[in-house]
Every structure is written in structure tokens, then in C-alpha cells.
Amino acid sequence: MDDNTGTEGGACSESERAGGWFIVEAIVDRRTGDPISSDDDEEEDEAGEDFVDFIDDTRSLGDGQEVAQELFQQQTAADDDVAVQTVKRKFAPSPYFSPVCEQASIEHELSPRLDAIKLGRQSAKAKRRLFELPDSGYGQTQVDTESGPKQVQGSSETQDGRQDDDEGSVVQSTLDTGNQNGRQNNDEGSGRNVGEHGSQEEERAGGDGEESDLQSTSTGKGAGGVVEILRASNKKATLLGKFKEQFGLGYNELIRHFKSDRTSCADWVVCVFGVFCTVAEGIKTLIQPLCDYAHIQVLPCQWGMTVLMLVRYKRAKNRETVAKGLSTLLNVPESQMLIEPPKLRSGPAALYWYKTSMSSCSDVYGETPEWIVRQTMVGHAMEDAQFSLSEMVQWAYDHDITDESTLAYEYALIADTDSNAAAFLSSNCQAKYLKDACTMCRHYKRGEQARMSMSEWIWFRGDKVQGDGDWKPIVQFLRYQDVEFIPFLCAFKTFLQGVPKKSCLVFYGPADTGKSYFCMSLLRFLGGAVISYANSSSHFWLQPLSEAKIGLLDDATSQCWNYIDTYLRNALDGNQICVDRKHRALLQLKCPPLLITTNINPLTDERWKFLRSRLQLFTFKNPFPVTTQGEPMYTLNDQNWKCFFRRLWARLSLTDPEDEEEHGNPSEPFRCVPGQNARTI
């Protein structure tokens, strides 16, 4: 039985009950301005007390009020969503803007009326998208849908089922009164008004990639053929993928990477995309005046023509120079180029260039680079040999190299012409070979020096000097310093002969008189060694004297003279001394002749009276003369010292060397490799 709570009487009709629709018309008892008596107030107060429970607030199911409340809640929720979307606009992804202006720009989408009053469409700057939508897992694929006047019905949903509400969209809801549960179906009733000129929608292609294929087909015509490159977030990855698709191998398998664009190289591997057909054919001729070798392949693709080149320029160029030059020749931007140097020691890479050069799809100009020939020709492959340490030692000995860093650099430079140097670079023990080679070279040099007398050593050092000089600047400089030449020559003769107590020359004088300049030039010619008193606290500071024919102690002070007077009297005598060498046993040897420069006269100080008989002193009084350009007025170089010794060879009582022109060289040149010297018959 239907019991309608809140109604009195059961004989009323359905229209008179609270569950139906009815119209209530108010009855006006008083008008505005009518006087109100106290009786009326009392009646109102009494009526309020009497009719407290007159209105029934209880709601019965099925009376239709839940539909109105549901509608009100939905409208309130829609208004709240619009307000939140307006406040947090920066968290929503920006509308997509086509970089080639094939669709309407963002300003035109947001304000179609503003676009309508313009005389012509303006090119707008590309807008940066703030946030990316979640991808399906197959890459950042973007598709631009058609733009035009249309009305979108229904709701746009993302892949996770949430409704995609754009800013400024109008939510249109309809009430479904026939629904028993009173709920609204948003999927069928909601929609979005796009506008008069339509809008650009950015969509994500799914795993099948059908929409992406359609877009690439539509943009592959005319000027939009390289739109895919422009839109790609990683343009280089797009070009590398297209290269592997066309040529069947990776671009990185043919090249080595240069991080800097300023690194120079003569050989370059260049791949250019989107070249016009006529230009691609013309580059085969235009590139020839610029290079010594060119290997060019031209293949068609949907972007245009793809040009792959292996080029050896006549002069070394960096990546920026190569890109600018080819951009001018091919009329293609640098963003459509891959430019890297080739792999010079990769057999598969060299074989690829060799095999493709013989095919009909390649055009080759010039002589094949040696790094391709060396790795592909059978004759060159047979010539590859194992590394020989003795050959490296012989090369270091012939070029007078005993420093490890210098030997490593110089020997690597000849790897293109020397098979042993190439084998050295291919070895995994380069550091060990380098250290061993320098050690052996120093041993050979030390043994050769110890075998020679002073006369032979001076002649040997003179043969290493290229060119002839003049001995007169040396004599003129001594006269400028008021040094008598004949007494100096006599003292210098006994100095070279190592006569006891005559094997130390001291050059005394004030500063800037040329003492160190004179001694250093002589020491450089004779290949001597320098010792420094600053290292006197070490037991090994005299070790360089064991490996030299002559020594130099520059700028001796009072403390240094005290040390010499205390510990080095026998060294100045030219007698046998004992030298401590680091990590090696003590060595007993005769001290070589020693040059000393000082600002203190040791002959006038009573503290060093026992050194007076062991020193031969020469005084430099005058400042060293220089020209207006700052150059020394008296040039003391190796050529002048060579001429000085050859000119005064007999006066210095040096032994005459054997006549090599008439009698030939009595001894063969030193060889540290097995085999015999090749002699002519």
C-alpha cells in the first residue's frame, strides 16, 4: 500500500500530493507601506509557535528530487573543473604548433575571430610544449590531424580512461530522465565545441603506427619532405636510422667520433640527406677540385637523394669548415648532414669502401688512401710483421732520442711508412716497449761516450752540427770582457786535457755580464751536464757528472764555495771520486772538467785559500752587449763553437782524427739489430 508521508487525507488526487508537480501562488495580505499593529505581531509570534511541526522535511524515494540534486552536483562539479583548469593552466600541455606552418598556429586556434580580421596569415614562433603525454612505448610519435571547421560530439578520452578537458571548452550536459538510477552518461552526453576555424590536436600513435605512416606519406611531398627530421626530438638518431635503412649497416661502424668541431682531419665520411637529384649528380664534379680522393654513392629515398661520400681533402679541415662547404655546394642545411672521420684501422670498414668502390653505384676519383690499401691488398697484408724492439732502439739511437715522451710521439708519426712502428701502435704493451727502448738507448749512448777520448768526443759533437759558423764572435766577446785570448787558450787547453788542479775554470764578475751565456753555449755544444747546489741536500746531486764529458755549476754562492772547500777538493783536482747514484751501486770515476760561474771572487777570500791552486779564474767586467732589437751582439751558437774548435784544433793540442776521406771510416756505424751492413761492390 502506498503511504505518502506528509499528506493528510487519503482521498486527494495524484496531482494534489507532494510527489507530483504543482504550482503555488502566493496570497498577499498586506502591501508595502501598510501600518502594522501590535496585534498582528502577536498573531505572527503565536503562529510561529503553533506551526513548528507543520512542514514535513522528510523526503520519500521516487519523488523526483534526487534527479534535480544530481543535476545540480554535476553542474557544480563542471564549474569547479573549469575554475581549476583556468588557475592551473601551466600544468596542461601546450597546443601543438607545426614547425613548417602547415596547420593553424596556436594564436589562431585560441582566437578565431582575431585570425579572421587579419589580412594575411602571420608566421608565428614555435611554442615549446611544457609536458609530454605518456607514450605507448614505441617512441615519441606525433601526428597532426586535419584542421577545419567541425563540431566534435562526445568526449575525448585518453588511454587511461580520463576525460581530456581543454581550456575554454563548453561542457554540454543533457538530463536522462528515463534512467531509473538517475545517473548521467557522460560518454554520450558531453561534447566539446572546437570553434569556427577548428583546432590542432596532438595525438600519440599507438603500437601499430598506422597514423604515423599516413602522416609521413602526406608530408613527403614538396617542401615538407624533411618534416620528419625537423619534428624529431633527436635529429641525429633519425638520420642514423635512415642511414641504416638505406645502406644496410650502421654509420658508426664506418667512422670514429670527434667530440670537438674544431679538430682538423684530411679524411671525412659525409652523409647528406634530402638533396635534389640534379645537385646530387653535380657534386661528383664539383668536389674534385677540392680533394685528392672522393668516393661518392647516391641513393634515392622519400626525402630526396642521399649522398654518402668518403673524401680526402687537399688540406686538413675541421667539421665546421666541411659542413659549410658542402652546405653551399649541395644547398642543404647542416642539420641534414652526418660528418665524422673514418676508421683508419678497421678492416671491415676498409673492406666496405674497397668493395663498394668497384660497384656500379659508386663514383671514385683519385688515388685510394693508403689505409684502405694496407688493409685490403694481399701484398700489404703479407708485409705485416711482429714488433721488433731492436728496430725501435736503433731508430731512437740514430735520431738521438732518449726521452720516453719524445720517442713515443716521433715513432708514432712514422707508423704510415714504417711497418715496425705500425706494429708498435697495434701492441698492447706500448708503455713497456717504450721504457725498454729508452733505457737501452741511454746505455748505448753512455757506452759510446765512455769509449771516446775528449778529442774524439769534440769531433763527434761537431759532426752533428749542420752548417759552418764563424769563430771570430767568440774571440771578440773575450776581448770585450778584457780577457786575454792567449792565456785563455792555454788554460782552456789544460782544462780539456784534464790536467790535475787545472780542470776547473771559474768565470767571475758582476751580474749581466754574459758569464752564464758563455758557459751554457759551450756546454750545449759539448753535450755536458748541469749540477745545481739547490740539490746538495741529496746524496745524488752529483750523479749527472757520471754521464757527461763536461759539467757546469752555475751561480755559486758563499755556501756553495764552503761545500766545495769541504767536500769537493779532490773533484777540482781531477782525481777519482765516488758518486752515489739512486737505486744503484756507488760509482768510482774521474771527475770531468767543471765550469763554475759566480759573483764572488774565491781567490781573495781567506776562507777558501786551499782552493786557489785548484781554480783558474777569468773576470768578466763589462755588461753583456745587445742590439736595439734585443739580440746578442756576439752570437755564441753551436756553429760558431764548431768553427772555433776546428780552427784552433792544433793550438788546443787535440789529437788529429783519422782522415776519413782518404782512408775511409775505420769503424762501422753502430748497429743494435742483427744482420750485416749492406755494402756496395
From Swiss-Prot:
E.C. numbers: 5.6.2.4
Residue stretches of biased makeup (Basic and acidic residues): 185-207
Quote the record's binding site residues for ATP.
G509, P510, A511, D512, T513, G514, K515, S516
Phosphoserine modified-residue sites: S94, S98, S111
Q: At which residues is the cross-link Glycyl lysine isopeptide (Lys-Gly) (interchain with G-Cter in SUMO) found? A: K590
Pfam families reported in the protein's UniProt record: PPV_E1_C, PPV_E1_DBD, PPV_E1_N
Localisation per UniProt entry: Host nucleus
Fetch the PROSITE patterns from UniProt.
SF3_HELICASE_1
Which ranges does the record mark as transmembrane?
A: none
Q: Name one GO cellular component term.
A: host cell nucleus
Spell out the residue ranges making up region: DNA-binding region: 218-384
Keywords of this entry: ATP-binding, DNA replication, DNA-binding, Early protein, Helicase, Host nucleus, Hydrolase, Isomerase, Isopeptide bond, Nucleotide-binding, Phosphoprotein, Ubl conjugation
List the biased-composition ranges (Polar residues).
138-158, 170-184
**One function term, GO molecular function aspect:** ATP hydrolysis activity
Spans annotated as Disordered: 124-221, 657-681
- For the keyword Metal-binding, the answer is no
Name the domain of life: Viruses
PTM comment: the record says: Phosphorylated. Sumoylated.
> What is this protein's function per UniProt?
ATP-dependent DNA 3'-5' helicase required for initiation of viral DNA replication. It forms a complex with the viral E2 protein. The E1-E2 complex binds to the replication origin which contains binding sites for both proteins. During the initial step, a dimer of E1 interacts with a dimer of protein E2 leading to a complex that binds the viral origin of replication with high specificity. Then, a second dimer of E1 displaces the E2 dimer in an ATP-dependent manner to form the E1 tetramer.
Instruction: Give the family from UniProt.
Output: Belongs to the papillomaviridae E1 protein family.
User: How is this protein organized at the quaternary level?
Assistant: Can form hexamers. Interacts with E2 protein; this interaction increases E1 DNA binding specificity. Interacts with host DNA polymerase subunit POLA2. Interacts with host single stranded DNA-binding protein RPA1. Interacts with host TOP1; this interaction stimulates the enzymatic activity of TOP1.
Q: What is this protein called?
A: Replication protein E1
Q: Which organism is it from?
A: Human papillomavirus type 10
